[in-house]
Amino acid sequence: MVLSKTVSESDVSIHSTFASRYVRNSLPRFEMPENSIPKEAAYQIINDELMLDGNPRLNLASFVTTWMEPECDKLMMESINKNYVDMDEYPVTTELQNRCVNMIARLFNAPLGDGEAAVGVGTVGSSEAIMLAGLAFKRQWQNKRKAQGLPYDKPNIVTGANVQVCWEKFARYFEVELKEVNLREDYYVMDPVKAVEMVDENTICVAAILGSTLTGEFEDVKLLNDLLVEKNKQTGWDTPIHVDAASGGFIAPFLYPELEWDFRLPLVKSINVSGHKYGLVYAGIGWVVWRTKTDLPDELIFHINYLGADQPTFTLNFSKGSSQVIAQYYQLIRLGFEGYRNVMDNCRENMMVLRQGLEKTGRFKIVSKENGVPLVAFSLKDSSRHNEFEVAHTLRRFGWIVPAYTMPADAQHVTVLRVVIREDFSRTLAERLVADFEKVLHELDTLPARVHAKMANGKVNGVKKTPEETQREVTAYWKKLLETKKTNKNTIC
C-alpha cells in the first residue's frame, strides 16, 4: 500500500514561489508580518521588486563606483561581518586603514618624514569627512579666540554656492554661518577674489572644491592660497583652507600632477576625498587627512577601552563595516600609481568622445571644461520648444539615467544635463549614448511643444518676459510634472 499526502497536506516548502500564496498577498509596508515565509520566497519577492530600480551601470548621475573586480568582491564578502570599530579584535583591518591613510596623505604631498605616520581617518563618505574637518577648524578657531579673550560665538565658513549639500548640513548642524560666493553665467565655481573678500576675523576656514559637483571644474586653490596669505599678513589672522577633493582627489595626482592644490600650499590644513568615487570602491568609504598633528585638536579625539584595548577614535558614528576599508587597500596595491593613471586616462578619453559627439549634433552648448573631473555638463542651445528636463525624462526610456538641474545663485536661469564618466563607462557606451540623444531630440522635434503655447512670443497676459523668466517658468513646470509622475503610482508610460 502506497502512502501519500493529499494536495491540501503537501509541504509548502516544495512549491514554486510563484505557485505559493506569497505572491498573492501585498508585501508588508508599515508593520512586521505575524508569520514567517520561506527564504526562497522572501528572496524572490524582494528581487522582483528590485528589478524596477534603475541599472547602476547606466546611472550617469552618480559619481559612485558601480563595478569592481571579482577578487575584490570576494574580499568584501569575506569581511562583511567584521565591525570596523572592534580594533582589538581585528587589528589587521585597523592596520589596513592606517596604511590607506598614509598612502593618501603622501599622494596629497603631506609634509611627512620617512616612516612618519600621517594623521587621518576613514569615514563612511566625504560628508562625514567634511563634518570632521569642519569641527576641527571650528575648535581650533574657538581655542585661539578664547586665548585672546575675544568672542567665539559667531563662527563662519566661506564657500562657493556650488558646494555639495553636506557643507550646508555642517553649517546648520554645528551652528556655523555659511557665507557663499554666488556664481554667474559661464563661471560656475567659487571666485577666489570674492571669497577672500568675504573672509573676516570669525572665518574658521575657506572651503575650495577640487571637482565641482555641477560641472566637474577644479577651483583655483593656488590663487586662493596666495590671496589668503596676503590677507592674513595684512590683518594678522591665520585663516586656513580646506580642500573638498571628494571627486578630484583621486584624479588630479594622476592626470594633473603639476597642479598645486594640496598640502604643497601652506594654508591647506585638511583634505577630504571619496574612496567610493574615483578611489574606485563601492559606496561608502571616504577619507580625511590633516597636514600635521597640530591641525587636529586633541580634545576632539576620544579614547575608549570597553572593546578590549585603548582605542583613539574621531568619527561621528561608531559601528561600521570593514569591507570598504579592505577594498580601498586592495585597489591601492592592486592598481598602484600606474593603474590609477591608466583608469583616469581612459575616463578622460571617453569623456572627450562623448563631448565631441554631443558637439557634433549642433544642439548642445558644453558647459563643463575639458580639464577636471571626467564629466560632460551641457545645455540645449535652443530650449524654446523643449527643455533639458524633457530630454532627461525621454532618455529614461532607453535605460539611461541622466540628471537635469538648475544652477545655484546667481545662475538659476541656466539648466544643464550632466553625464559622469566612471571607470566602467566605455567608448562604446559613449557612442551609444550620443546616438540615443539624437533619437530623443528627433522624437521631441516631431512633437508639439507642451509648455510654450502661451509663451511662444515671450508674452503672458500681455506682459513681455525676458528669456531668463521664460526659462525659469518652463523649468518649474517640468520639475512639477516629473515629480507628479514619480508620485503617481498609477501612471502608465
Swiss-Prot record:
Natural source organism: Arabidopsis thaliana (Mouse-ear cress)
Top EC category: lyase
Cofactor: pyridoxal 5'-phosphate
SUPFAM superfamilies, alphabetized: PLP-dependent transferases
GO terms of molecular function: calmodulin binding; glutamate decarboxylase activity; pyridoxal phosphate binding
Tissues/organs with expression: Expressed in flowers and shoots. Detected at low levels in siliques, stems, leaves and roots.
Protein name, entry field: Glutamate decarboxylase 4
Reported function: Catalyzes the production of GABA. The calmodulin-binding is calcium-dependent and it is proposed that this may, directly or indirectly, form a calcium regulated control of GABA biosynthesis.
Keyword set, alphabetical order: Calmodulin-binding, Decarboxylase, Lyase, Phosphoprotein, Pyridoxal phosphate
